[in-house]
């Protein structure tokens, strides 16, 4: 049976480009499923329309249509995030992609983040470049991101090449991506580490590995890694946690580069997952140094510090 690739798009502004992408995929024997997240006008060509998406979310188009731009984008983003996992559970698609500008990419990525680990996801955007943050497109999920180089506005030799590349990647994932079970008879153990805690974590994992009872998975506690571990715990992919690096909590509390983990340690408690906690790196924060050499606190020279590289400085929170 042919695999199906879903395309999340705003057909009111990108219909021609979306249908071209669908034709590229269909010519290779794959099926397509177009998810229209338009917020302005209703057009044909979708497998599920904005009206149907909103209806599943509990909103009628008549109530949605008068909303302003910002409000309509916010509502449609939430509606798409609510509906996409339903569509996946219904078997509507195997891979999901989005090709467009900043607005479409942000909306599509928000929806993709609701899908489980290992469901292939690709966001291609003209804003996936430069100093833009990857948080809005990837966050703590396994989303592939591609810069489209040119704006996806019309079909030309550049945009068609980009669309072909994205579709080819999607077809490759549909054909060859696979998930692996844990080693037979072993529980999966998730552990956190950072450069300054890596020796301790690695020594602990070596001792655990010798027992032959666990498969170890290590997460870089960089503001996202801790969240990734906890997401996999929620999905039932991690059975035991060895949380040896907690400085994400410090950054979340007093500031620093590795922010973004404001609910750390909660998942194991909520899901009754065995967990050993060690306050590794709890007494430090990280600072990102930009190309102009800015980003460090004024009193940095009064504190113990280690430069991880030219861009990141590990700093003690006390003088």
Question: Where is each model-derived feature located?
Answer:
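N-terminal phosphate-binding or glycine-rich loops at protein starts, especially the Walker A/P-loop
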Residues: 2-41, 95, 101-123
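Gly/Ser/Thr-rich loops at beta-strand to alpha-helix junctions
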Residues: 10-16, 94-107, 128, 190-201, ...
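Glycine-rich phosphate/diphosphate-binding loop of Rossmann-like nucleotide-binding domains
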Residues: 14-24, 33, 39-51, 184-223, ...
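Phosphate/nucleotide-donor binding subsite
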Residues: 44-92
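Cap/lid and interdomain-hinge subdomains that line or gate substrate/regulatory clefts
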Residues: 65-68, 131-196
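Short, acidic/small-residue loops that bind anionic groups at enzyme active sites
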Residues: 95, 107-137, 144-147, 217-221, ...
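Short Gly/Thr/Asp-enriched flexible loops that form oxyanion-binding sites at enzyme active sites
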Residues: 100-117, 201-204, 255-264
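A glycine- and small/hydrophobic-rich beta-loop-beta segment
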Residues: 247-319
């Amino acid at each position: 049976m042919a695999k199906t690739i879903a395309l999340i798009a705003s057909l009111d502004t990108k219909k021609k480009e979306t249908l071209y992408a669908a034709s590229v995929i269909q010519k290779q024997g794959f099926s397509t499923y177009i998810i229209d997240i338009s917020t302005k006008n209703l057009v044909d060509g979708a497998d599920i329309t904005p009206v149907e998406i909103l209806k599943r979310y509990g909103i009628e188009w008549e109530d949605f249509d008068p909303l302003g731009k910002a409000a309509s984008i916010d509502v449609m983003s939430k509606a798409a995030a609510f509906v996409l996992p339903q569509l996946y559970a219904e078997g509507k698609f195997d891979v999901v992609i989005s090709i467009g500008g900043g607005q479409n990419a942000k909306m599509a990525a928000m929806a993709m983040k609701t899908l489980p680990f290992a469901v292939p996801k690709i966001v291609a955007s003209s804003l996936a470049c430069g100093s833009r943050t990857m948080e809005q497109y990837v966050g703590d999920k396994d989303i592939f991101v591609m810069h489209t180089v040119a704006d996806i506005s019309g079909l030309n030799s550049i945009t068609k090449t980009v669309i072909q590349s994205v579709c080819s990647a999607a077809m490759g994932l549909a054909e060859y991506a696979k998930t692996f079970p844990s080693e037979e008879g072993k529980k999966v153990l998730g552990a956190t580490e950072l450069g300054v805690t890596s020796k301790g974590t690695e020594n602990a994992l070596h001792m655990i590995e010798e027992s032959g009872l666990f498969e170890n998975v290590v997460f870089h506690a960089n503001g996202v890694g801790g969240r990734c571990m906890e997401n996999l715990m929620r999905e039932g992919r991690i059975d035991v946690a060895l949380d040896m690096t907690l400085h994400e909590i410090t950054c979340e509390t007093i500031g620093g580069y590795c922010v973004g983990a404001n609910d750390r340690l909660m998942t194991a408690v909520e899901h009754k997952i065995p967990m050993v906690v060690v306050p590794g790196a709890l007494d430090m924060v990280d600072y990102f140094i930009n190309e102009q050499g800015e980003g460090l606190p004024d009193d940095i020279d009064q504190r113990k510090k280690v430069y991880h590289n030219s861009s990141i400085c590990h700093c003690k929170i006390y003088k």
